[in-house]
């Protein structure tokens, strides 16, 4: 059982919104309307941890250990939304998200295989770690730069916890877990081919609500994410390479063999599909 240790570790590292954010350093002259608007969009996106947690708890009723960790993940992710909203409330109240705008991103996701979802969110945390690092560099106002640094650190730690649950899944479920993690790993490292940001909030999750079944499609500006990444924080190929390399290194450690690139991971993935293909 991982939850007791994970809780203790994250508890020691948890930052305090009142004490660890230098609110008194705010400089209005260093915050543009463009930058403030992206903070609003990030805040609403972070609020989507609510439906994601509902999905995790529904699909992991068999795993009370992981479900208990969701209490920590949900708390910290909702705090991300809250600190961004507090920043806007203090300094740009005209851009603070409304309750209705927040509620728009709460809808029921279709059931999905828990192992696939675990890997999907591990990759999402690795990606968001780098997105927020780049956002901290792009922002010019010192308080929000500091906040994005805090968020990036949290996302990296969350990814580390997901990785530990992935290790546990391999110990317990063997090749079933390896196949799921390799399959989703190939998907989530293939952003160049997909031509869209590969993050859980940008993937279709509900047939009932299609095409408005991604988190991003329910934001006030559904196209903001691509613009934020490409034109604003300029998350270019060098930054994307950091994400892909991190995922490949972690999977190399997880599976006990080196992956120099996505093609290596894809070859590894195919070994789990061959028996089924032969049987058919």
Identify the meaning behind each predicted range.
Residues 1-280:
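Non-heme di-metal
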């Amino acid at each position: 059982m991982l939850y007791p240790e994970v809780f203790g570790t994250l508890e020691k590292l948890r930052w305090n919104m009142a004490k660890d954010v230098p609110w008194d350093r705010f400089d209005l002259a260093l915050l543009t309307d463009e930058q403030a608007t992206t903070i609003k969009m990030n805040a609403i996106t972070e609020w989507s941890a609510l439906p994601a947690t509902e999905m995790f708890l529904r699909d992991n009723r068999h795993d009370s250990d992981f479900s208990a960790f969701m209490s920590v993940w949900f708390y910290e992710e909702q705090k991300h939304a809250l600190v961004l909203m507090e920043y806007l409330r203090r300094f740009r109240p005209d851009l603070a998200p409304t309750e209705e705008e927040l509620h728009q991103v709460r809808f029921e996701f279709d059931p999905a295989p828990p192992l696939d979802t675990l890997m999907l969110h591990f990759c999402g945390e690795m990606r968001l770690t780098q997105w927020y690092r780049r956002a901290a560099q792009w922002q010019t106002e010192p308080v929000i730069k500091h906040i994005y640094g805090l968020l990036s650190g949290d996302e990296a730690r969350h990814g580390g916890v997901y990785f530990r649950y992935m290790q546990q899944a391999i110990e317990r479920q063997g090749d079933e877990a390896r196949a799921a993690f390799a399959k989703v790993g190939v998907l989530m490292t293939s952003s160049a081919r997909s031509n869209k940001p590969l993050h859980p909030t940008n993937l279709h999750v509900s047939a009932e609500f299609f095409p408005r079944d991604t988190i991003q499609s329910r934001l006030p500006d559904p196209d903001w994410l691509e613009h934020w990444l490409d034109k604003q924080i300029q998350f270019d190929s060098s930054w994307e390479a950091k994400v892909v390399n991190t995922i490949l290194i972690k999977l190399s450690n997880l599976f006990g063999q080196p992956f120099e690139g996505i093609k290596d991971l894809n070859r590894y993935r195919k070994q789990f599909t061959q028996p089924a293909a032969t049987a058919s």
